[in-house]
């Protein structure tokens, strides 16, 4: 085994304690009781597979490694000299908030393995946590380090979105405060809305100007709208709220009722808000290329039981499992990314919570509302025009629209539209899994 000789770079610097080396300067100053910083001479070396290079002195003022990087990911990979990577694409940067949470714990390893962006797409993961979750975030980074994913070229962790979101091309915003006992929906809108307003500003300041944003933290539709309103330099079409888990649940229920495998179910739309006002659309859905209503000839089941099963699935899962749906949510995030980077099959579509301006359905503008989309696989999408509406569908689409308009009024102070007025509809419409 070759051993590299380490020679000093003769660049003296102040080194903070290693367990705090990824914190922003502001947060370092705010923490009390820190071990005293020490002054050392920097040692540097460069490693590449099957090759040990002679250490080279770093010129004065040069930065050898980013202070936010983690462990083995701090070393420079020489992609030009790695035979297996010559056909790889240019590395993309993915930022994830709530990265120490259970959803992210399932998602990050899917991203790192290549099943999301492809077997020739190297990625950098930038993980955002909080002061409270920072040690857990270090643990996540350690597990990624130990997993030896060849496509995972960089991992960095931090608690400042203005640092973590830098150059991000995808932002998966999962972090949000859960709804606690006695908390009203208006309270949750305000608390999480402030988080997403700040993250929107951070994206605007430091992310790629064409960053694609998927909001998962609830209430995700209005959180996505708030996030959209705060970065004026990012196209509104780039913001999505997660609907895919609801779509997957709807496909599952239709497949079970029809006695077929779920891959036979297509053209499923979830209209509206991610709440109990959501509208699983069986009018346009198909099974084996045939309209659902011609396969499942049970109108009452479709209008009542099917819709309730989809809406309440998360609550039933909690009763059985004792926890919310983290793994299936992570899968649904992957499923939400896939149709944006893969051309939509002819005749099919996928739902996503997107900006309503210019929509062909008559839905109020300036909302994030789940609607049917098609994509050419370039990260962009267009709304589907050839959909059928009946009175049942229109009435329920309108109800969900009114709820989102009320949520928008309740968060006007976070979107720059004036004083908030909370006149949310009576009754609790939050999905059971959000509580």
Curated annotation (Swiss-Prot):
Record-stated family: Belongs to the LDH/MDH superfamily. MDH type 2 family.
InterPro entries: Lactate/malate_DH_C, Lactate/malate_DH_N, Lactate_DH/Glyco_Ohase_4_C, Malate_DH_AS, Malate_DH_NADP-dep_pln, Malate_DH_type2, NAD(P)-bd_dom_sf
Function as written in the Swiss-Prot or TrEMBL entry: The chloroplastic, NADP-dependent form is essential for the photosynthesis C4 cycle, which allows plants to circumvent the problem of photorespiration. In C4 plants, NADP-MDH activity acts to convert oxaloacetate to malate in chloroplasts of mesophyll cells for transport to the bundle sheath cells.
Reaction equations catalysed: (S)-malate + NADP(+) = oxaloacetate + NADPH + H(+)
Top-level EC class: oxidoreductase
Residues that, per the record, bind NADP(+): 98-104, 192, 216-218
UniProt source species: Spinacia oleracea
Name of protein: Malate dehydrogenase [NADP], chloroplastic
């Amino acid at each position: 085994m070759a051993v590299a000789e380490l020679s000093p770079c003769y660049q003296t610097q102040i080194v903070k304690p290693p367990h705090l080396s990824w914190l922003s300067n502001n947060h370092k100053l705010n923490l009390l009781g820190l071990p005293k910083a020490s002054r050392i001479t920097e040692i540097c070396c460069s490693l590449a597979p099957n090759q040990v290079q002679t250490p080279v002195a770093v010129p004065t003022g040069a930065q050898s490694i980013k202070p936010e990087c983690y462990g083995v990911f701090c070393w420079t990979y020489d992609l030009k000299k790695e035979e297996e990577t010559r056909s790889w694409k240019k590395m993309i940067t993915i930022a994830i908030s709530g990265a120490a949470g259970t959803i992210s714990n399932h998602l990050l390893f899917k991203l790192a393995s290549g099943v999301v962006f492809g077997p020739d797409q190297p990625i950098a993961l930038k993980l955002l946590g909080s002061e409270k979750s920072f040690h857990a975030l270090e643990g996540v980074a350690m597990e990624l380090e130990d997993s030896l994913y060849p496509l995972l070229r960089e991992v960095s962790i931090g608690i400042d979105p203005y640092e973590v979101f830098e150059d991000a091309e995808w932002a998966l915003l999962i972090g949000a405060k859960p709804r606690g006992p006695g908390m009203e929906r208006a309270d949750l809108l305000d608390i999480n809305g402030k988080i997403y307003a700040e993250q929107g500003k951070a994206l605007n300041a430091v992310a790629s100007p064409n960053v694609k944003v998927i909001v998962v933290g609830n209430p995700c539709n209005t959180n996505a709208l708030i996030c959209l309103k705060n970065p004026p330099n990012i196209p509104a079409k780039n913001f999505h709220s997660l609907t895919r888990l609801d779509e997957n649940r709807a496909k599952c229920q239709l497949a079970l009722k029809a006695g077929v495998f779920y891959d036979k179910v297509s053209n499923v739309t979830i209209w509206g808000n991610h709440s109990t006002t959501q509208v699983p659309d069986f009018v346009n859905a198909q099974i084996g290329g045939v309209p659902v209503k011609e396969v499942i000839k049970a109108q009452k089941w479709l209008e009542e039981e099917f819709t309730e099963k989809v809406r309440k699935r998360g609550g039933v899962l909690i009763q059985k499992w004792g926890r919310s749906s983290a793994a299936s949510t992570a899968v649904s995030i992957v499923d939400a990314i896939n149709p944006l980077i893969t051309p939509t099959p002819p005749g099919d579509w996928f739902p996503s919570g997107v900006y309503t301006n210019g929509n062909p359905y008559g839905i109020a503008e300036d909302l994030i509302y789940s609607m049917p989309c098609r994509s050419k696989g370039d990260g962009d999408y267009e709304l589907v025009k050839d959909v059928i509406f009946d009175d049942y569908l229109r009435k329920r689409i309108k109800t969900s629209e009114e709820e989102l308009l009320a949520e928008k009024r309740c968060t006007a102070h976070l979107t720059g539209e004036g004083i908030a007025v909370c006149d949310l509809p009576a009754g609790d419409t939050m999905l059971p899994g959000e509580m």
